[in-house]
């Protein structure tokens, strides 16, 4: 009787460990993963056509992507994710012609303008 009871309890305990529902009840720590270049709103707002690559490099830092086939295009990307789910994503693409900045694209431009406007409103007495 004792051996049968111990064997049955061991089997139930082993099978209980296989339950996915029970495991999900216990929270686990998930790292917040930050990848890419987090660009300062003032630095993005300071970009002007006619700037050299060196000036842009000093202002924004090294780009995440420098395409070997499109050397006149730099991509700055920023992602924040937790548990494999992206919480925040922003992109900025900078285009050059003959080593001079000609245009920029990306959602960072609008976010930078809004952030600067908010800062100016909060700085006023």
Swiss-Prot record:
Task: Fetch the PROSITE patterns from UniProt.
Answer: PROKAR_LIPOPROTEIN
Q: Where is the lipid attached (N-palmitoyl cysteine)?
A: 18
Any coiled-coil ranges, and where?
none
Which residue positions does the secretion signal occupy? 1-17
Q: Where in the cell is it found?
A: Cell outer membrane
* Organism annotation: Neisseria meningitidis serogroup B (strain ATCC BAA-335 / MC58)
Annotated lipid attachment (S-diacylglycerol cysteine) = 18
GO terms for molecular function, please? protein-macromolecule adaptor activity
How does the protein associate with the membrane?
A: Lipid-anchor
Question: What GO biological process, any one, is recorded here?
Answer: protein insertion into membrane
The entry's protein name is Outer membrane protein assembly factor BamE
Q: Which gene encodes it?
A: bamE
What's an example GO cellular component term for this entry?
Bam protein complex
């Amino acid at each position: 009787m004792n051996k049968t009871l111990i064997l049955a309890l061991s089997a139930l305990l082993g099978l209980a460990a296989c339950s996915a529902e029970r495991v999900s009840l216990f929270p686990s720590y998930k790292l917040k993963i930050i990848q890419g270049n987090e660009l300062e709103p003032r630095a993005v707002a300071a970009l002007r056509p006619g700037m050299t690559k060196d000036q842009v490099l000093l202002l924004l830092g090294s780009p995440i992507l420098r395409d070997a086939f499109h050397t006149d295009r730099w991509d700055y990307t920023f992602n924040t994710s937790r548990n494999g789910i992206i919480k925040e994503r922003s992109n900025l693409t900078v285009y050059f012609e003959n080593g001079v900045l000609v245009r920029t694209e990306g959602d960072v431009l609008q976010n930078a303008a809004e952030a600067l406007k908010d800062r100016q409103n909060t700085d006023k007495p």
